[in-house]
Design a protein with these regions (language model features):
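Histidine-acidic metal/acid-base catalytic patches
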Residues: 2-17, 22-36, 41-45, 49-63, ...
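Active-site acidic/histidine proton-transfer and metal-coordination neighborhood
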Residues: 12-14, 18, 24-29, 89-99, ...
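Charged helix-capping and loop-helix junction motifs
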Residues: 51-54, 82-85, 114, 118-122, ...
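Residue-level detector of anion-binding/catalytic polar loops
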Residues: 66-67, 96, 134, 191, ...
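Conserved beta-strand positions in the central sheet of alpha/beta enzyme cores
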Residues: 69, 99-101, 137, 193, ...
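Glycine-rich, proline-tolerant flexible connector loops at the mouths of alpha/beta enzymes
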Residues: 69-87, 143-147
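Residues that line or immediately flank small-molecule/substrate-binding pockets and catalytic motifs
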Residues: 72, 104, 140, 250, ...
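Metal-dependent catalytic neighborhoods of phosphoester/phosphodiester hydrolases
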Residues: 78-84, 111-114, 291-293
């Protein structure tokens, strides 16, 4: 005879009442926060810095991280052999490959261009699957009405839509395009994490509008602590319940585009209040040598989260 969960719990409760002398089990110890580092931290799109992803994995292990987040644009090869070498390199170093950071752009009135980026995102999802990575960072893309990324940053991430179109058009395109990617995400077991990363993801309301519209467990949020340039804490908290990966920015030596004085003890307490269980992945974006700044960042983050 089967026993329902409700009946089991009721019987268990009765047993406790009947035997008051039985001591309650002590609470389980709090889970330790796991820290990863993005390979971007060592490279930063700078040809003078370390691009070799395998060496970045080795450094992550030497510095005491638990995992590594791979930046696709940093990888020099996408062949199966190369992907499996990266996976083995992480395994040998006892590191998780915990995140895959990719780029795509859906803010274009050109339907063929949008479809090209849908196909790209599907391919990227399949690469994440081959690497055994459970979550992949995705973006809305930008309107590309800025001359370059430096100008976009000078304007605090704000840019006008393409002439003749509005953000409302853009939301429809992004929702449609990401919706087309979800079947592959489910098939591959890769949770897409929409990042608060410029474009229509510049605000928490924009990110949540897209995620809530699709209502899929395979589209959640990648939460970047450094992409809300004003009043970040309330904005970060709005996204925390949906977060599957947290990217923690640091800026030792001064930021490449800007510097934020982030209160990590406050951020850690907020994430703990929302019972965030996942990885905190360091994205170092400062001018100091990564070989000194990355370990310094890890030490700071550990202290903040251990005390939360």
């Amino acid at each position: 005879m089967s026993v329902t969960r409700r009946a089991f719990l009721a019987a268990s409760g009765a047993a406790v009442v009947a035997h008051p002398a039985v001591a309650a089990e002590p609470p389980s110890p709090a889970r330790r926060t796991r820290f990863a580092v993005s390979t971007y931290s060592f490279w930063q799109f700078n040809p003078k810095q370390l691009q070799d992803v395998e060496k970045c994995i080795d450094l992550a292990a030497e510095m005491g991280f638990d995992g590594v987040e791979l930046l696709l644009r940093q990888m020099t090869d996408e062949s199966p052999g190369y992907l499996q070498r990266l996976k083995q390199r992480a395994f040998i170093n006892a590191l998780d490959l915990c995140g895959f950071s990719t780029h795509q752009g859906f803010l274009s009135p050109d339907k063929a261009e949008r479809q090209k980026n849908v196909d790209l995102t599907i391919k990227q999802t399949e690469l994440a699957y081959q690497l055994g990575i459970p979550t992949m960072r995705v973006n809305t893309g930008t309107w590309r009405t800025s001359k370059n990324f430096n100008e976009l940053m000078k304007n605090r991430g704000i840019e006008p839509p393409v002439k003749g179109y509005t953000d409302e058009d853009g939301f429809g395109w992004v929702i449609d395009c990401l919706g087309q990617c979800l079947k592959t995400a489910e098939k591959c077991g890769v949770t897409l994490g929409l990042e608060n990363h410029w474009g229509l993801g510049r605000t928490p309301e924009g990110v949540l509008r897209i995620v809530d519209a699709l209502k899929s467990p395979w589209l959640r949020v990648t939460l970047d602590t450094g992409n809300f340039l004003e009043d970040p804490y309330d904005k970060l908290e709005k996204l925390a319940p949906q977060a599957v990966l947290v990217q923690a920015k640091t800026y030792y030596g001064g930021g490449l585009w800007y510097t934020l004085e982030l209160d990590y003890p406050r951020i850690a307490k907020m994430l703990k209040a929302h019972k965030y269980p996942g990885y905190v992945s360091l994205e170092f974006e400062g001018k100091e040598d990564p070989r000194t700044a990355v370990p310094k960042s890890l030490e700071m983050l550990r202290k903040a989260f251990d005390r939360a």
